[in-house]
């Protein structure tokens, strides 16, 4: 889907800049749902703020602490 690729191409560089890895990516109903692994919960919150500033609608879901970081669910439209 062209819209999914467009979203990924715009979100990808921000993920790389924040050193955040996408463990899982699902595109459905015009939304990109991703399970992201970051160095900290704060990094996921910063990512959400950056993407909101770029005009995306972003929802940060459940964040779970892990060894060496955090995993969070993010929905982007």
Region spans (language model):
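Periplasmic/lumenal scaffold domains of single-pass inner-membrane subunits
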Residues: 2-77
């Amino acid at each position: 889907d062209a819209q999914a690729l467009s979203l990924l191409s715009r979100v990808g560089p921000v993920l790389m800049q924040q050193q955040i890895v996408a463990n899982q990516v699902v595109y459905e109903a015009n939304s990109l749902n991703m399970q992201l692994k970051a160095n900290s919960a704060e990094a996921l919150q910063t990512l959400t703020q950056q993407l909101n500033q770029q005009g995306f609608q972003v929802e940060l879901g459940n964040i779970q602490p892990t060894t060496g970081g955090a995993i969070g669910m993010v929905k982007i439209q």
